[in-house]
Amino acid sequence: MGSKFHAFMFPWFGFGHMTAFLHLANKLAEKDHKITFLLPKKARKQLESLNLFPDCIVFQTLTIPSVDGLPDGAETTSDIPISLGSFLASAMDRTRIQVKEAVSVGKPDLIFFDFAHWIPEIAREYGVKSVNFITISAACVAISFVPGRSQDDLGSTPPGYPSSKVLLRGHETNSLSFLSYPFGDGTSFYERIMIGLKNCDVISIRTCQEMEGKFCDFIENQFQRKVLLTGPMLPEPDNSKPLEDQWRQWLSKFDPGSVIYCALGSQIILEKDQFQELCLGMELTGLPFLVAVKPPKGSSTIQEALPKGFEERVKARGVVWGGWVQQPLILAHPSIGCFVSHCGFGSMWEALVNDCQIVFIPHLGEQILNTRLMSEELKVSVEVKREETGWFSKESLSGAVRSVMDRDSELGNWARRNHVKWKESLLRHGLMSGYLNKFVEALEKLVQNINLE
């Protein structure tokens, strides 16, 4: 291996982004590289336990400036509703002087970033290489962000796009309308991401050639930037904290592979009528289920929003829970037979490396594209059908679940076989370490080239 480097990391102030960056930091620190991790003060406490190499990874906190429209003390996406994201982006942009000072003093070799599109400018000023680390699927980047296209072109497939399946259809293109919204000071979300992709030295993506190679090649060709793959970087199971007794005891009442686990991510808050339809769809399956979702809009608790008579009807086999749960440990429990998910990027990988059948109810544009990748390219899952309005019915949900849970179902057996194949491929010995070794070697060469310039 080459000489050791010092990397700065500056992720977006959302915990999904920060934890993905920290997971990569741990992998680099494992190989004795030094990391300075820039983050809001509030986030430090929540992330410290995930820093596995405190001798190599140093947290450097930033003071998040006040911004009109941003609640006092808000520093991360968990402090605000999704509608206030633009104000948080403005706050991030206004840390630029602090970040520049940190780079000046710390003298890193590399800076990893995602939403802070001005990082490449600072990097060039100090002779540092910038790495745009993407924490969404390559397919999503390939269809959404292409040089020479405008925000108005998002409803059509870019020329040369390598898939006829991983697409948005009809009304689904509206799910990308947020890309044209203001996001930070004087820029839209689309412009912010495009500037970062065009100006960075290297693009890196948490994926693997086996799954998304053609999308990565398309991105590399479009941006004329080297695309480095970290591999899937699957999190190691945390065996230090067993599954909470409440869920261990409840799940143990049921036969192996019989329970549906449903979780729609931290961002999704359903309308009350759609929440009730979700509950009724679970009831309609006739199977035991655990649903972990936030209370719907307009409700302060799960209980007040449940359909009339629902709790009494399902009390022996169903739970709807509004709090946090240990998702990886629940998915690993032998009683779980089906995972119903929104198909966020993290949940997508979790689904692939577990044994349960997979059903997706995507909500956002990125999630829809992830779902098409999983259901139509890899053929490991089933997507719940929606109406033109975006509504999904209890019948479409229960039908999708039954189609994968029924042992006599051709669709279920087909998805099961493909899932086993992909799980074995992703978990085969040496795959992840091989990707990581190549990734680190490429970074070391990048740093060596700086020193030769």
From Swiss-Prot:
Pfam family name, one:
UDPGT
CDD domains to which the protein is assigned, alphabetical: GT1_Gtf-like
Q: What is its EC number?
A: 2.4.1.-
Top-rank lineage group of the source organism: Eukaryota
Claim: Transmembrane helix is one of the keywords in the record? no
Do the record's keywords include Methyltransferase?
no
Gene3D superfamilies linked to this entry:
Glycogen Phosphorylase B
Q: Which InterPro entries match?
A: UDP-glycosyltransf_plant, UDP_glucos_trans, UDP_glycos_trans_CS
List ligand-binding residues for UDP-alpha-D-glucose. Answer: 266, 325-327, 342-350, 364-367
* Broad EC category: transferase
Query: Which PANTHER family does this chain map to?
Result: GLYCOSYLTRANSFERASE (PTHR48049), UDP-GLYCOSYLTRANSFERASE 79B6 (PTHR48049:SF77)
* Similarity annotation: Belongs to the UDP-glycosyltransferase family.
Q: What is this protein called?
A: UDP-glycosyltransferase 79B6
